[in-house]
A protein has these predicted regions:
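Viral RNA-dependent RNA polymerase
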Residues: 1-368
């Protein structure tokens, strides 16, 4: 257990926030580990042991968020507005994109519990019904387009959508369903029953974690808030989106000829009958899912994960969220040549690339 925690502790992103309470004294994970490495490692080991030996009978009782905190099962999550350009509509509505990072110790514990499933997801890309780990390089683009075409032959035209406010929709029931889904899908060799038990209990208790703002603790009164900063956030969000997609298909009685490929809150679906998009949207709304930009792919092009794919072009995809990519690059505390090259590579297929390239290299002259 010590070696497992050590391995994942050494993998955390050094420039990310260590979360509460370490963020009271340290600006990032690197600074915290440099000063308190042994103590942090021991805390990770102790907490992982608690999850692996937890008594499932506590699930029959009413969950008390403070009990979880006081008994050391998890730390409070912090919350802040994500540092990125926001659409004007979000500013008008006051609906900013919030991030709720988990503590450094919880990052490591969750990585210990779930990293093998995340790895299995990426190694079985598409086959597992997930696009987590999809590459936007030519090989990844080619694989994705071929997958979309094969699914269209099987189920009919593809649709594209994303879910508004997806991170706030995850009820305890959805967490529980995702745990059972994982148990059925991921039959990872050597995973003992106590790991699955820890997974089940974590899935039941995670929705009751506490949020800290400043020095005040808040209990979540609205069900469904996905924390970020976990090694499992992307995979779990993707699982939730897949479960929601199939539930909508069941309600519409189209599940026998339906499939969905999600990556977080973005998804492509197949099997929605012609002229039934509005029914699909309304059915989703009836279970609290607001679908944005729901439409059929057309003209041989399809949107997915902020990229526009052209079926007749497999050398890359057009990055539609390039302002965010440039902003993220410009706000890095330490800007490396790799960061600039990565942004330029992402924007390579955009029609505005010559102008964007000149701008990027002017403000960040690190690339020949």
């Amino acid at each position: 257990m010590r070696q497992l925690c050590l391995r994942h502790l050494l993998k955390v992103h050094g420039d990310k926030s260590p979360g509460y309470p370490l963020n009271l004294d340290y600006t990032n994970n690197h600074a915290a580990m440099e000063s308190e490495f042994v103590g942090i490692l021991n805390s990770c080991i102790a907490r992982l042991h608690m999850w692996l030996t937890i008594d499932e009978t506590i699930l029959a009782e009413e969950i008390d968020s403070y009990w979880l905190l006081e008994n050391g099962y998890m730390d409070p999550s912090t919350i802040f507005i994500k540092d990125e350009p926001h659409p004007e509509r979000k500013l008008v509505d006051g609906k900013y994109r919030c991030i709720t990072p988990v503590s450094l110790v919880d990052q490591v514990v969750e990585a210990c519990l779930f990293s093998e499933m995340s790895t299995a997801n990426k190694e079985s890309l598409f086959a597992s019904g997930s696009a987590v780990g999809i590459g936007f390089h030519p090989d990844g683009v080619r694989d994705y387009i071929n997958y979309v075409k094969s699914m269209e032959k099987k189920y009919g035209p593809a649709t594209e959508d994303d879910v508004s406010g997806f991170d706030s929709l995850h009820t305890p029931q959805v967490y529980e369903a995702s745990a059972e889904y994982d148990r059925l899908i991921f039959r990872i060799k050597g995973v003992a029953e106590n790991w699955w038990k820890a997974h089940r209990v974590w899935s039941k208790l995670k929705p009751y974690s506490i949020v800290v703002i400043g020095d005040v603790l808040y209990v979540r009164t609205d069900e469904g808030m996905m924390d970020s900063g976990s090694r499992d956030t992307s995979r779990r969000n993707t699982t939730f989106r897949r479960l929601y997609g199939f539930y909508i298909a069941v309600l519409m009685d189209i599940v026998q000829n339906f499939d969905v490929l999600p990556n977080g809150d973005d998804a492509n679906s197949w099997g929605i009958p012609e002229n039934h998009l509005e029914t699909y949207r309304k059915t989703a709304a009836s279970i609290g899912i607001t679908l944005r930009d729901l439409r059929y792919a057309n003209d041989g092009k399809i949107n997915f994960c902020s990229h526009l794919y052209d079926f007749n072009r497999t050398d890359g995809a057009v990055l539609t969220s390039w302002p965010k990519a440039v902003y993220k690059m410009l706000t890095k505390k330490v800007l490396e040549p790799y960061d600039v090259r990565q942004v330029l590579e992402e924007m390579r297929c955009n029609t505005q690339y010559p102008v964007l390239s000149q701008f990027v290299q002017k403000v960040a002259p690190l690339v020949d």
